[in-house]
Swiss-Prot record:
<feature type="binding site">
    <location>
        <position position="330"/>
    </location>
    <ligand>
        <name>DNA</name>
    </ligand>
</feature>
<feature type="region of interest" description="Large ATPase domain (RuvB-L)">
    <location>
        <begin position="13"/>
        <end position="201"/>
    </location>
</feature>
<dbReference type="InterPro" id="IPR008824">
    <property type="entry name" value="RuvB-like_N"/>
</dbReference>
<dbReference type="InterPro" id="IPR027417">
    <property type="entry name" value="P-loop_NTPase"/>
</dbReference>
<comment type="function">
    <text>The RuvA-RuvB-RuvC complex processes Holliday junction (HJ) DNA during genetic recombination and DNA repair, while the RuvA-RuvB complex plays an important role in the rescue of blocked DNA replication forks via replication fork reversal (RFR). RuvA specifically binds to HJ cruciform DNA, conferring on it an open structure. The RuvB hexamer acts as an ATP-dependent pump, pulling dsDNA into and through the RuvAB complex. RuvB forms 2 homohexamers on either side of HJ DNA bound by 1 or 2 RuvA tetramers; 4 subunits per hexamer contact DNA at a time.</text>
</comment>
<feature type="binding site">
    <location>
        <position position="201"/>
    </location>
    <ligand>
        <name>ATP</name>
    </ligand>
</feature>
<dbReference type="InterPro" id="IPR003593">
    <property type="entry name" value="AAA+_ATPase"/>
</dbReference>
<comment type="similarity">
    <text>Belongs to the RuvB family.</text>
</comment>
<dbReference type="GO" id="GO:0005737">
    <property type="term" value="C:cytoplasm"/>
</dbReference>
<dbReference type="GO" id="GO:0005524">
    <property type="term" value="F:ATP binding"/>
</dbReference>
<dbReference type="GO" id="GO:0006281">
    <property type="term" value="P:DNA repair"/>
</dbReference>
<dbReference type="Pfam" id="PF17864">
    <property type="entry name" value="AAA_lid_4"/>
</dbReference>
<feature type="binding site">
    <location>
        <begin position="148"/>
        <end position="150"/>
    </location>
    <ligand>
        <name>ATP</name>
    </ligand>
</feature>
<feature type="binding site">
    <location>
        <position position="82"/>
    </location>
    <ligand>
        <name>ATP</name>
    </ligand>
</feature>
<feature type="binding site">
    <location>
        <position position="86"/>
    </location>
    <ligand>
        <name>Mg(2+)</name>
    </ligand>
</feature>
<feature type="binding site">
    <location>
        <position position="86"/>
    </location>
    <ligand>
        <name>ATP</name>
    </ligand>
</feature>
<dbReference type="InterPro" id="IPR008823">
    <property type="entry name" value="RuvB_C"/>
</dbReference>
Length: 352
């Protein structure tokens, strides 16, 4: 949820520093430490809810690698944040009966960092690199021979004293995860034998995830309430579970109950400024800004400047869901509010 000062007027789109949005699909430290969330993770591909086509393809590839006693081909998983890329990497390693070693691309700052990771691998292990599109060029180039030939080609020394050294590596599987497929260079992308998109989840799939987690945390969740929560979770399990935890907080602290009803969910989400579409204050301010421009396309940088926000954040965090539900369209000339989006925002009080 975007926390916006109550002093902001209807026509003032300059935001102060924001806290976490409940409907932001990015992970946060609290969620990484949450034991209940870790317990809620599936233990194998069969337990993983949703992504049926992806699971079927992975099942065939995994079984084939086991039959041939070869490492699984390098795998690239791409899609919006919060859809389960990291979980799938762990499950793939589990199905292969091997370890999964984790790294994030921003933490691999120098070539020696990736060298250390590769030299630490054992035969058949999985190396998972999150945000792989953020690898720097030198680090990425070291991966080429490692992925293709399971070797490192290193240059030692400098100038006339430079010499090449080749280090053989154990056969391993690299799993890369990215939210920005287009940002991955073609040479790196082409070295992945398996490339799979993780799609948004259906309401029924999210409902099952919510119900399973509510049982884990001993929460009495009414059937219709679980579906209502699934509908506003933006097709993203991470958001669904985050909203459920905040609704639980409201139920236990404000309403003094452990039973979650449809009416209680409405009250809880209203207190967090989230409406029946799953949109929060930032979404509504974005739509209101477009609505003020009388159906004239607006460039992303102009929108970011008008809202006092980061253009990259708007493009990759705010806009995808607004496009998905038909409220926003992107044109060569800029962003346009659709008729559906205009009808929605005209019906809303900007102060919610």
């Amino acid at each position: 949820m975007a926390i916006i000062s109550s002093n902001i007027g209807d026509n003032d789109f300059s935001f102060r520093k924001k806290e976490l949005r409940l409907v932001d699909s990015k992970n946060i430290p609290e969620e990484k430490r949450n034991n209940n969330l870790n317990l809620a993770r599936p233990l194998n591909l069969k337990e993983f809810i949703g992504q049926e086509q992806l699971k079927s393809s992975l099942r065939v590839a995994i079984d084939a690698s086991i039959i041939r006693k070869e490492p699984l081909e390098h795998t690239l998983l791409y899609g919006q944040p919060g859809l389960g890329k990291t979980t799938l990497a762990f499950l793939i390693a589990h199905e292969l009966n091997t370890k999964c070693r984790i790294a994030t691309a921003p933490a691999i700052e120098r070539p020696r960092d990736i060298v250390g990771l590769l030299l630490g691998l054992k035969e058949g292990e999985v190396l998972f690199i999150d945000e792989i599109h953020r690898l720097n060029r030198l680090t990425e180039e070291l991966l080429y021979s490692a992925m293709e030939d399971f070797r490192l080609d290193l240059t030692m020394g400098a100038n006339r004293g430079a010499r090449c050294r080749t280090i053989n590596l154990p056969r391993f599987t690299l799993i890369g995860a990215t939210t920005k497929l287009a940002s991955i260079s073609a040479p790196l992308r082409d070295r992945f034998g398996i490339s799979q998109k993780i799609e948004f989840y259906t309401c029924d799939e999210l409902k099952q995830i919510i119900v399973n987690f509510s049982r884990l945390i001993n929460l009495n969740l009414e059937d219709e309430a679980s579906y209502d929560l699934a509908k506003i979770s933006r097709g993203t399990p991470r958001i669904a579970l985050r909203l459920l935890r905040r609704v639980r907080d409201y139920a236990q602290v404000v309403m003094k109950t452990n039973t979650i009803s449809v009416n209680l969910i409405k009250k809880a989400l209203n207190s967090y400024q989230i409406d029946e579409k799953g949109l929060d204050s930032l979404d509504r301010h974005y739509l209101s800004f477009l609505n003020q421009n009388n159906n004239i396309p607006i460039g992303l940088d102009s929108i970011a400047s008008g809202l006092g926000d980061d253009s990259s954040m708007l493009e990759f965090v705010v806009e995808p869901y607004l496009i998905k539900i038909g409220f926003l369209t992107r044109t060569p000339r800029g962003r346009l509010l659709t008729a559906l989006g205009k009808k929605y925002i005209d019906s809303k009080d900007d102060n919610f």
